[in-house]
Amino acid sequence: MAHFAEINENNEVIRVIVVSNDELLDENGDEQESLGATFCNTLFGGTWKQTSYNGNIRKNYAGIGFTYDSTRDAFIPPKPFASWVLSEQTCQWEPPVPMPADEYFYVWNEETTSWDQVNV
């Protein structure tokens, strides 16, 4: 099964649907994203981009609220905190300070731009 994300005029993902792989096959039996996008457009209208759970296309699996960046050809999740920066390699948001790698649990504190240990 193939997955397609509908993006609005602001390049925000507004829904993701599943499409049979048969809808993507050309006359030679090769999958073509454009055929799947046309199929989705015929059914629902709008603009559609293929997405993948394994991240082999467009960096991340699209979710509602994600943004499609045409320059990076990637789906980018919503920014969780103002201080976090986008990794160009993964198109995931990363904290300005890495989370400690020890046996404790942490939550991000945006006020101090640091990790706070959580007592469990």
List each language-model region with its residue ranges.
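Interaction-interface detector
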Residues: 1-120
